[in-house]
């Protein structure tokens, strides 16, 4: 059994890298703009991760994404970013982690996809 302090230490370490969230298609390609989930030098996020449950990182609220016509949405990924020497924020390539949905949806016309906060989480378990 892992003690709560160790479990939450792992959770908090991973959470510090979760700076944005993006939707992906079934190939893992980004299909939406990145929505910031932590503060950057010039931005305070609307959407954040909740860490009040031991060992869990969960979206604190639903996150809406604008989706173009013909785009498939099949999952979400957490991203990190960096500030360059000039103080400009850029998103890192690649993802930290995320989840694929049981089924994907393809938008026949432009619309909105809402990633629901309650079922969107990462459960940390150290074995």
Per-region residue spans from a language model:
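Small cysteine-rich, disulfide-bonded extracellular modules of the LU/uPAR three-finger superfamily
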Residues: 1-76, 80-127
